[in-house]
Amino acid sequence: MGSFRFHEWLICEIETDDGIIGIGNAALAPQLVKKTIDTYLTPLVIGEDPFDYSYIWEKMYRRTHAWGRRGLGMVAISAIDIALWDIMGKITNKPVFKLLGGRTKEKIPVYASKLYSQPIKDLQKE
């Protein structure tokens, strides 16, 4: 787990049998998300083909059904899902947006908020 001064993050790494590492992240209650992944979701992912992402996602979704359809369970599933897409991109040598269907617009509007209240130089040092 890593952290900024004001916010903790969980970095989820999944390594394939071939040594390819996919990286996902979660920004809600990282200690609890880690426990959820380690205890409940990892056994559902080990040995699966990352390209069977819908099947894996459904297994994880059903496993967390009793917790509701938001919050901790969904954050944990999302961290794994992001890592699986990263693996697929690395295996195919394509950016994930291409795997998701490619470009849909000529231009994409950009949005930024003042989430980080420190100067960017200070954040880069962290």
What are these regions (language model features)?
Residues 1-13:
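Short, Gly/Pro- and small/polar-rich lid/capping loops
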